[in-house]
Regions:
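Conserved acidic residues
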Residues: 61-63, 145-146, 164, 198, ...
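Adenine nucleotide phosphate-binding catalytic loops in nucleotide-utilizing enzymes
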Residues: 6, 41-43, 62, 67, ...
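ATP-dependent carboxylate-amine ligase
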Residues: 1-35, 46-48, 64, 80, ...
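Phosphate-binding loop of NTP-binding sites
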Residues: 19, 23, 72-200, 204-217, ...
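Redox-cofactor binding/interface segments in oxidoreductases and associated redox assembly factors
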Residues: 64-67, 149-150, 168, 202, ...
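Short glycine/serine/threonine-rich phosphate/pyrophosphate-binding segments
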Residues: 12-16, 114-118, 265-268, 319-320
Length: 435
């Protein structure tokens, strides 16, 4: 059986391709994007061929998997239909594969990629597990019992999963092109949580997780005292964070970790919660958490002399705030410069005021033109990066051509924040720093 993934360079699609390849299937893919993306490196390592033209080889034994970014009218999908091939959407195929294992899903507006990656790292080292992470990382073996996946709420895609544990890192309004309002989001998460076979594990510090309508047991983690699992005696330093964990007021263990920011404490508590219920030893869990190297494009650092470059996927105001605060914790004596690309016109319109507030937490903010993704400018008249830049305390527009504005900030920590890699800017600034 051969699988043909249309839109294979996407983070989720590329990870699914890796998993199908690991399980012994022939895998090829197609993508409109002819530029090199960070997801391609792992595909190349596995020998998975990527086509960017029509010279692919598909036949009656091919199953087609369509990325949600690929429309039904795309020529590759039209061709597949003309050949009467079976076509699955990404989440449908992932559900078919993952539901064969003891599934743990991680959902949430923020933190799900890091939490999934962190949980996979620990479980992989404590008995083995399969995993699919939204940073383009995927691995599977038929011998493993557990499967950890990042579950996306967009278009309610996470409803196809039947997890043992359903994790919710937080609930917030995002994907404003789909969800009608906050209640619609809460309803979607309630449906997702009620698919859990064992239990729901949710961040109880988040007010919206307390509003879920559930018929399954739920276990809350957080920093607030009214949670089932609580981090106490927290100390943040430039070396990381340490804290004690109590489960229903009983001491579980001490954790001293090289992580930065309150959000990382919460992400870690989600992982510890699963480990506790799987009866794993706290010291072993702590030892494996310590060796976590981070998820792709999540506070990914490059150090050149006294300048720190950070590549991060952050695009929602909550995520941008978390990255800036983590930077200040780790490098308290450095200027923090944010280079931000707004993602989609609908998000920019909905979150402009919040983005202004969080970007003002940086010492300097540069803003690129909006990345439209699937949207069109004509549908959002008057929505552009100027509506953010005009209200920043110390902000200005930047383009690939005006990258030299960054020269003034040699010696600072410079945060490149965007779901799409701001490659040209980073490369030009990196070349300058290496001269």
């Amino acid at each position: 059986m051969k699988y043909y993934l249309v839109g294979i360079k996407g983070a989720g699609m590329s990870a699914l391709a890796l998993i199908l390849n690991d399980l012994g299937y022939e895998v090829i893919g197609y993508d409109d994007d002819k530029n090199h993306e960070f997801t391609e490196d792992k595909l190349d390592e596995r020998g998975i061929k990527i086509f960017t033209d029509e010279n692919n080889i598909i036949d009656k034994n091919t199953i087609v998997i369509r990325s949600t970014a690929i429309k039904e009218s795309h020529r590759e999908i039209v061709k597949a239909k003309s050949l009467d091939l079976k076509i699955y959407e990404y989440n449908e195929m992932l559900g078919k594969v993952a539901n064969m294992f003891e599934l743990i899903t991680v959902a949430g507006c923020h933190g799900k990629t890091t939490t999934t990656s962190l949980l996979a790292h620990v479980l992989k080292n404590m008995g083995g597990c399969n995993y699919l992470i939204g940073d383009g990382t995927g691995y599977a073996s038929k011998e493993n019992k557990k499967f950890v996946i990042e579950a996306c709420e967009y278009y309610r895609h996470f409803l196809v999963y039947e997890p043992n544990y359903a994790i919710i890192t937080n609930i917030e309004l995002d994907h404003v092109d789909y969800f009608k309002d906050m209640q619609d989001v809460i309803d979607a998460y309630s449906e997702y949580a009620n698919n859990a076979e064992k239990m729901v594990i949710a961040c109880g510090d988040d007010p919206y997780t307390r509003m879920l309508e559930l018929n399954k047991p739920i276990f809350y983690y957080g920093i607030d005292e009214d949670n089932d699992i609580v981090a106490k005696n927290i100390e943040y330093t430039s070396d990381g964070v340490e804290f004690d964990v109590f489960v229903e007021e009983n001491y579980y263990g001490h954790f001293d970790l090289p992580f930065y920011g309150k959000h990382m404490v919460l992400n870690t508590l989600a992982v510890i919660s699963v480990c506790y219920y799987e009866r794993m030893d706290a010291k072993e869990v702590s030892k494996n958490l310590k060796t976590f190297g981070g998820a792709e494009r999540r506070f990914e650092e490059t150090i050149i002399g006294d300048t720190i470059l950070v590549d991060d996927y952050a695009h929602h105001p909550t995520e941008v705030k978390a990255v800036i605060k983590a930077a200040r914790q780790k490098y308290p004596n450095k200027k923090v410069v944010a280079v931000f690309q707004p993602h989609t016109f609908s998000r920019t319109q909905a979150f402009a005021e919040d983005l202004i507030k969080v970007l003002n937490l940086a010492d300097k903010a540069f803003v690129l033109d909006i990345f439209p993704s699937r949207e069109k400018q004509e549908d959002f008249p008057g929505i552009n990066s100027d509506i953010i830049v005009g209200k920043l305390n110390n902000g200005e527009l930047i383009t690939d051509e005006s990258w030299d504005k960054l020269k003034e900030y040699k010696g600072a920590i410079v945060l490149f924040l965007s779901p799409k890699q701001i490659q040209n800017l980073m490369e030009k600034f990196t070349e300058y720093l290496n001269c």
